[in-house]
Structure formats: structure tokens, C-alpha cells
């Protein structure tokens, strides 16, 4: 089963209960979690309550200014999460995030794999974002041909393949499944295309880094013409004005 913060276009909803399995065969549940607090009476991050066996860490930056004082405050909560991963579990982390590396260095019980890293899981662009060569420790694992674009989606693919491998799915089968993945609504979703060459995308990016990454992906796909970005700062962090400078820089 799964519970995520968006609606996959391959499925009808953002959540599904696990199907019944044979006796002694474990069922799996995938949950998208973040560091926001649990409730007004429990200021621990929500993900502390999930007790994962396989943990994917995509990124760690300052966010949720209404809850956290600074980046170190968030690192503390991520450290609590990392410490509850069992010894037989696995942490799959983004090698490009220094903050994640620093948090992992605080101590962990479990095995660690990195993606977006030549020493771990990596990709090479073959013919644009739609064709990626997937490698693990410099050994080719297969070619991913899909409809998604952008470095963030490619990194997510690496993390998904690594997580699938940890629960017993071969990289070959994971890559084949990803080739059928159509993306998530409001995540770089192309909602209109006009005869004059104008394409219209809808994206949920609400953090300056996410906005910058989204625009970078579009720039590599839409090679001609202007890019016009319309931003609605709706998150609490953005409404508090905590990232005015970062927001301006993300649009350059």
C-alpha cells in the first residue's frame, strides 16, 4: 500500500491499503513523510511515529519557519529518525545534500546507500531527460525510458530503484516499472500544449530550491522561447517572508 502527498496519474488516489499476502510473506507500505510536527500537543516530527525499515532521504534544507528555529533544529529531528532505523534496515540518502551527510555522521545503526553519487546509484542522460542510463557503483543496471524530466525526478528514480532493491526487487524490474510511471499531478505536470508552441506546466514547488530545480528542468526541455513563471507563495514559510532573498535568486 501507499500514502503520498500527491495523486499519481497511474492510480486513482493518493493512498491505498496493502493487499492481503500469503502467510509469512510481509506486506509493504510506502509513506511520504516530512519533518513537520505531529500535533499541537506533540512537537516531534511526524516521521518519528512511522518506524520505517527502508528510509529514503531526498533532501534537507531549512523550511517550516513556523515550527523550526534554524537548520540545526531540523537536523536534530532527522537524527532522531535515523537512529530508529533498525540494524537490518537501510538508509538511502541523497549524496548531494551536505546537511544529510552531516546528520548521518551523527550516528546510525544501519547500512547506508547513496544516490546521485558515482560510488552508489547514478544516472547519465542518454537522449534528453526521457532516456537515462542507470548505474550502481559504476556498473550499468539498465536504460530508463520515461516521460518525466528534470534532475530531481531522475534522482527520485535512483532512490526508488535503490529502495526497491532493498526489499527484494531487482533493478531491472524496478526500471521496467518506472518506464510505465506517468508522474504525479501538480508535479511538473504538462496541463496544456498550444499550436503556437506554448506549453503550460503545473507544479507544486513551494520552496526556492524546488522552484529553481523545476525551472532548470524546463530550460533543458523547452530549448526555445521565454519561460514565464507564476508563483503563489502559499506555504507558511513563504508567507512569513523567511526566504525572500532565496526566492529572488531561484528565478535568475
PLM region spans:
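Short, well-ordered secondary-structure micro-motifs
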Residues: 13-15, 103, 212, 239-242
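Active-site beta-alpha connecting loops in nucleotide-dependent enzymes
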Residues: 184, 209, 216-252
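Glycine/threonine-rich flexible loop motifs
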Residues: 40-43, 66-72, 238-241
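Acidic, Mg2+-coordinating active-site environments of NTP-dependent enzymes
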Residues: 10-12, 16-26, 30, 37, ...
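Switch II of P-loop NTPase G domains
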Residues: 37-51, 208-220
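Cofactor-binding loop segments of dinucleotide-utilizing enzymes, especially the Rossmann-like FAD-
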Residues: 5, 94, 117, 232-234
Amino acid at each position: 500500500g501507499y500514502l503520498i502527498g500527491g495523486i499519481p496519474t497511474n492510480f486513482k488516489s493518493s493512498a491505498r491499503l496493502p493487499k492481503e499476502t500469503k502467510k509469512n510473506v510481509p506486506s509493504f507500505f510506502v509513506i511520504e513523510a516530512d519533518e513537520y510536527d505531529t500535533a499541537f500537543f506533540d512537537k516531534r516530527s511526524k516521521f518519528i511515529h512511522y518506524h520505517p525499515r527502508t528510509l529514503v532521504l531526498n533532501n534537507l534544507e531549512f523550511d517550516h519557519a513556523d515550527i523550526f528555529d534554524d537548520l540545526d533544529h531540523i537536523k536534530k529531528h532527522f537524527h532522531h529518525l535515523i537512529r530508529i532505523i533498525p540494524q537490518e534496515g537501510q538508509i538511502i540518502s541523497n549524496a548531494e545534500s551536505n546537511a544529510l551527510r552531516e546528520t548521518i555522521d551523527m550516528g546510525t545503526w544501519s547500512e547506508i546507500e547513496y544516490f546521485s553519487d558515482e560510488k552508489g546509484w547514478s544516472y547519465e542522460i542518454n537522449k534528453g531527460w526521457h532516456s537515462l542510463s542507470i548505474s550502481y557503483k559504476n556498473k550499468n543496471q539498465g536504460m530508463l525510458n520515461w516521460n518525466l524530466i528534470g534532475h530531481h525526478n531522475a534522482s527520485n528514480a535512483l532512490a526508488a530503484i535503490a529502495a526497491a532493491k532493498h526489499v527484494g526487487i531487482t533493478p531491472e524490474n524496478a526500471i521496467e516499472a518506472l518506464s510505465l510511471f506517468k508522474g504525479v499531478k501538480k508535479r511538473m505536470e504538462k496541463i496544456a500544449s498550444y499550436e503556437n508552441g506554448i506549453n503550460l506546466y503545473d507544479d507544486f514547488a513551494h520552496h526556492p530550491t524546488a522552484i529553481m530545480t523545476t525551472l532548470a528542468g524546463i530550460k533543458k526541455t523547452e530549448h526555445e522561447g521565454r519561460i514565464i513563471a507564476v508563483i503563489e507563495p502559499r506555504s507558511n514559510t513563504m508567507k512569513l517572508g523567511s526566504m525572500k532573498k532565496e526566492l529572488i535568486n531561484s528565478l535568475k
